[in-house]
């Protein structure tokens, strides 16, 4: 869609009191700006007659044309904005530092490549992470991350308005904690604060990212863009380039070959057919994952009639008073997913009463209580052990001390939303980190903030 922005042209017509003509009669907008000639206000809104307002001031108001600007015409400014978005939390990475060494020339080069439609994404970097679950990640070069943020800034606002309220991944103000809170809200709503019986159906899509058909995804994205008038050539070009990129082409593998041992085929992009799978690690992949399943969200809410529904990426749930209605929904949802090349995970179909313990997004929810899952507490324990091994009993520098303090505070801030006091406090009390830090309880935090001891700074 063409955006309205102020682009100043020569004054529209004669400004000395005569008629002002808009010859093209094209319905452009107009803007009044100060002009140093002794003249009057001349206004023209698609007519041949000037609307004159005599003015005794030396500086009259001259009406100038304001024209719709295309994305190409604001591209350089948009690229600088995208760069600053992309570098958040990435200031110390090698690819970001390399890009910043010649920042202006790199952005201008990228600008010309995009204007001439000659931009080609760089090869991705592939590696395996094992953060509770083994995953294959494809990381893009920082240059491509800038383009991803550029595309995000252009289209995310449109798709955000189309998503259902209860989808939580990669949306502002709708992270994991919001997803947990909304699950509890829906349970209390259906059960009338646990005074009535209700059931929850939990489902999971098997190997979601690795089974997304890029051709189907592009059809969905382009259909929405055209429907709402987002037909700028640059925007359509970026859609093609980003979705059509083959992450496996000339990618660089990092790590040991043994890192891929035990990785299921459903989580490995190289085991998928050509044109299938999105790279985990790109910002655009998070956006596309929400777009791809938006039709599923609407199918469940509006066609199957489930008001109490929520989804985080490929993990979703439905709540209803009728157990039979939920059982019937399994086959209908499975059929819908088959039409877009997806399948339900056969081992992750769970239908049980809302009074049972419900695991979702690292939390275990039960009536009137919210606990952390074993996986979440184990991650905190592992992180604590890692920091202890780095600290040992030796003196640590200010930079490391600040990083450790920030990491612990982040975990404590998150765990403060759960009933995990005894476990967390025991781990902290027994930790050798207390030789470098002290815990100061604040009035608005369950565990307080970790602060440096004064004597540890000597």
Task: Specify the residue positions occupied by each region the protein language model found.
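A common structural junction motif
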Residues: 334-342
């Amino acid at each position: 869609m063409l955006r309205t922005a102020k682009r100043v042209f020569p004054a529209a017509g004669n400004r000395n009191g005569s008629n002002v003509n808009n010859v093209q009669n094209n319905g452009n907008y107009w803007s009044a700006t100060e002009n140093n000639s002794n003249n009057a206000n001349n206004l023209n809104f698609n007519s041949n007659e000037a609307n004159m307002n005599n003015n005794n001031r030396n500086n009259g108001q001259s009406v100038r044309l304001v024209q719709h600007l295309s994305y190409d015409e604001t591209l350089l400014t948009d690229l600088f904005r995208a760069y600053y978005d992309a570098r958040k939390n990435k200031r110390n990475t090698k690819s970001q530092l390399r890009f910043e060494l010649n920042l202006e020339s790199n952005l201008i080069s990228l600008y010309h490549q995009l204007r001439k439609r000659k931009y080609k994404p760089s090869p991705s970097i592939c590696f395996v992470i094992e953060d509770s679950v083994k995953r294959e990640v494809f990381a893009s070069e920082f240059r491509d991350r800038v383009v991803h943020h550029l595309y995000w800034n252009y289209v995310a606002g449109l798709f955000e308005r189309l998503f259902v309220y209860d989808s939580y991944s990669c949306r502002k103000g709708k992270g994991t904690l919001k997803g947990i809170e909304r699950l509890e809200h829906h349970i209390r709503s259906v059960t009338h604060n646990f005074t009535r019986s209700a059931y929850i159906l939990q489902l999971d899509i098997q190997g979601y990212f690795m089974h997304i058909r890029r051709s189907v995804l592009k059809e969905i994205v382009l259909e929405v863009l055209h429907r709402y008038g987002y037909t700028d050539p640059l925007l359509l070009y970026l859609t093609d380039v980003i979705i059509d990129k083959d992450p496996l082409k000339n990618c660089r593998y990092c790590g040991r070959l043994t890192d891929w041992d035990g990785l299921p085929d459903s989580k490995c992009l190289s085991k998928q057919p050509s044109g299938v799978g999105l790279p985990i690690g790109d910002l655009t992949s998070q956006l596309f994952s929400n777009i791809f399943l938006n039709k599923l969200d609407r199918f469940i809410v509006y066609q199957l009639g489930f008001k109490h529904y929520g989804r985080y990426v490929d993990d979703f749930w439905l709540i209803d008073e009728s157990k039979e209605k939920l059982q019937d929904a399994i086959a209908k949802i499975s059929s819908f997913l088959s039409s877009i090349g997806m399948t339900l995970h056969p081992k992750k179909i769970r239908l049980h009463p809302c009074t049972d313990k419900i695991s979702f997004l690292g939390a275990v929810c039960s009536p009137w209580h919210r606990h952390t899952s074993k996986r979440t507490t184990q991650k905190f324990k592992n992180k604590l052990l890692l920091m202890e091994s780095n600290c040992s009993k030796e003196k640590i520098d200010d930079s490391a001390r600040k990083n450790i303090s920030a990491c612990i505070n982040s975990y404590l801030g998150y765990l403060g939303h759960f009933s995990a006091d005894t476990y967390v406090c025991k781990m902290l009390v027994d930790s050798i980190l207390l030789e470098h830090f002290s815990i100061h309880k604040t009035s608005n935090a369950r565990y307080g903030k970790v602060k440096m001891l004064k004597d540890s700074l000597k």
